[in-house]
Regions:
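N-terminal amphipathic/basic leader segments beginning at the initiator methionine
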Residues: 2-28
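Mid-to-C-terminal polyanion-binding domains and interfaces
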Residues: 15, 89-93, 333-378, 411-412, ...
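Hydrophobic helix-and-loop "lid/oligomerization" segment in the mid-to-C-terminal part
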Residues: 17, 25-31, 35-154, 174-175, ...
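Residues at the C-termini of beta-strands that transition into short coil/loop
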Residues: 131, 198-200, 407, 595
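Short beta-alpha junctions and helix-cap segments that line functional grooves
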Residues: 140-143, 164-168, 181-183, 389-392, ...
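Active-site cavity-forming subdomains of large catalytic enzyme subunits
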Residues: 145-214, 218-235
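A generic local secondary-structure boundary/capping motif
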Residues: 168-169, 205-208, 293-295, 393-394, ...
Length: 601
């Protein structure tokens, strides 16, 4: 393993085949030594820890996080105590309480956490999830009317509601009590109701802004137990052990792509440990439906196996399937729901492929992806609103800039869109501003993702508004769009032992990226194109030793073309992944970027 030298660009790569610079992830030398001494780490791992901003006094908690050390005081969240009091009041009074959840994994996980706590308290909590196509995102007056007609007295919204001031006002006007639990960006003035608990609420000093909604709900469960205990409700009985449900908190954190630091890292790390038992009937059934075997749970299970299938219900099927799956204790019901979600996921993939192909052709025909503008906005008639977010993410990866994809209903002229952003460009804030300026019918989100509703004849205005509003962030964001390398390795050193050494830094996500390794002047052997535009090959060093490698969705891009051409002389950056196919314990490199030394300036 080598250090890559002192060049301002790692291996001299000032422009890779994807247009990015390569840099060594910076780490302060004194901090590297401190981690080596305090934790007994080898230099490469200590350097990676320091490069992730982990202080000397944080190293032990980072590598072995615990809830005891990192759990925040629930009362540090604005309105948390009021929310706990209102919900426990309802449980004690036997009031009809319903949960209103968003239709993604975070919403489903949040709802399931509350359902399981209510069940442990001997109470029921019916779930309401709006239909993405007919109702759209978040609470509405019509939805609250429906809940009122069903006999609801208290409604708890999860993963939504913080920006639904008008809808919540309507709910209160018709006699409903409302508690909002959310994590999305919101206006200064919250909805007027019993409580608005939001880790990103202006004035909230919890310091937990990186939590998903499921993380906020998990803290709420602790507050509920505390309030119920204060009232003597656990005299002679055990309080619900909320640690059993950490797997649901981890699902929300991983699938909502939250920053895995501090308390949120502990939730996720310990949640994956709980998930590894596969005690939740819904998760176990969904894993089986996906054709995977139970075993130690990783972020990959949540983000790439379970999460897309749970989301499929909200994207192109029945929105409440995911929440019902995660809430049920009936193995047969779980199996039926899991099989339905797996089938919907297959259908979703085909719809996604069609929309992606159309969007790529439309944008690249006009050159909008390469005209220097900070944002790409692309629309199409009758593109399924359930897949526009996934497509936006694919195109963001392809063009390395924020992308908003809008599906327009050709009948009513209303577009529903979703956007994905780049680090350093706050798309949620820009969309919120567009809504407040009257450009949108609805809109909101967070830094890296946003959703919106817009009239078709306002899309051009939206494009101009976003480009103007985000232009100032573009230079800094482009500087951030670098491939940051943790270490230079030879193919012979890219082993299972190296993978397991750096796996101590898991779980990975925003604020704790997977280790990135660079291989210099490798020879590409056995290149082959795969279905889906993927490329597989072997990367060999001067001594002939090689490592398996795969590059996703790049066969038609310069990096993929260079790999398919084969031959020597390329530099490759990527992440090591476990390769346990057919019982072998190997590794393969998941390629992030490719550079040709003849083209790096």
């Amino acid at each position: 393993m080598a250090d890559g030298g002192t060049l301002p660009h790692f291996l001299g790569v000032s422009r890779s085949l994807s247009g990015r610079v390569w840099r060594q992830r910076p780490a302060e030398a004194g901090l590297v030594r401190a981690h080596m001494q305090a934790l007994g780490l080898d230099e490469p791992l200590a350097r990676a820890l320091a490069a992730r901003g982990v202080r000397a006094d944080q190293g032990a908690d980072f590598l072995a996080p615990t809830l005891r050390a990192l759990f925040p005081d629930p009362s540090s969240f604005l309105d948390m105590d009021a929310a706990a009091e209102a919900i426990v009041d309802a449980v004690q009074a036997g009031a009809s309480t319903h949960v209103f959840a968003d239709y993604d994994v975070d919403g489903a996980s949040s709802a399931a956490l509350l359902v399981r706590w209510f069940r442990a308290m001997g109470a029921e909590l019916p779930i309401y999830v709006p239909d993405r196509l007919t109702e759209g995102y978040g609470p509405s007056a019509k939805a609250f009317d429906t809940l009122k007609a069903r006999g609801a007295e208290l409604v708890i919204t999860v993963d939504c509601g913080a920006a639904a001031n008008e809808a919540v006002a309507h709910a209160c006007a018709i006699g409903l009590k409302v508690v909002v639990i959310d994590h999305h960006l919101m206006r200064e003035q919250p909805p007027e109701c019993l409580a608005v608990v939001n880790s990103n609420r202006p004035g909230c000093n919890s310091g937990q802004g990186n939590l998903a909604a499921a993380g906020v709900v998990f803290v709420l469960l602790a507050a509920l137990n505390r309030e119920a205990r204060r009232r003597g409700m656990f005299d002679g009985r055990e309080a619900p052990d909320i640690r059993r449900w950490l797997d649901l908190a981890a699902m929300g954190a991983i699938c909502d792509v939250t920053g895995l630091t501090g308390f949120n890292r502990a939730l996720t790390s310990l949640g994956l440990r709980v998930m590894s038992d596969w005690a939740n009937p819904g998760l176990r059934a969904l894993l089986a439906a996906a054709g995977s075997e139970p075993g130690p749970a990783k972020c990959n299970h949540a983000g790439f196996i379970l999460g897309p299938r749970i989301n499929a219900g909200g994207r192109i099927g029945r929105s409440d399937l995911g929440a019902r799956l995660l809430s049920t204790d009936d193995p047969e019901e779980a199996r039926a729901l899991a099989e339905e979600l797996d089938a919907l996921n297959l259908a979703r993939r085909e719809v996604e492929r069609q929309v992606t192909d159309q969007a790529v052709r439309r944008v690249e025909a006009t050159g909008a992806h390469a005209d220097g503008s900070p944002v790409v906005v692309v629309e199409g008639d009758d593109w399924h609103p359930g897949v526009v977010g996934i497509v936006a993410g694919r195109l963001r990866e392809r063009w390395r800039k924020p992308v908003v994809v809008i599906g327009v209903d050709a009948v009513n002229g209303i577009g529903k869109g979703s956007g994905r952003s780049q680090p350093g460009m706050n798309l949620g804030r820009a969309v919120q501003a567009a809504w407040e300026a009257g450009v949108l019918l609805a809109g909101g989100g967070h830094a890296m993702a946003a959703g919106l509703t817009v009239k078709a004849d306002s899309i051009a205005r939206l494009r101009d508004f976003l480009n103007a509003g985000m232009a100032g962030e573009q230079p800094a964001a482009e500087a951030l769009d670098a491939v940051e390398i943790d270490a230079l390795v030879e193919p012979r050193a890219a082993t299972r032992a190296l993978f397991e050494q750096f796996e101590q830094l898991a779980p990975f996500g925003p604020a704790n990226p997977e280790p990135m390794f660079a291989l210099d002047h490798v020879t590409v052997r056995e290149p082959a194109a795969m279905n889906g535009g993927h490329v597989r090959c072997r990367l060999a060093g001067p001594d002939g030793a090689s490592v398996k490698a795969i590059a996703w969705r790049c066969a038609d891009l310069p990096a993929g073309q260079a790999l398919l051409a084969g031959g020597g002389g390329l530099s490759v950056a990527g992440r090591l992944k476990a390769d346990d196919w057919n019982g072998r314990r190997g590794v393969q490199l998941e390629i992030e970027d490719v550079a040709d030394p003849r083209m790096v300036g």
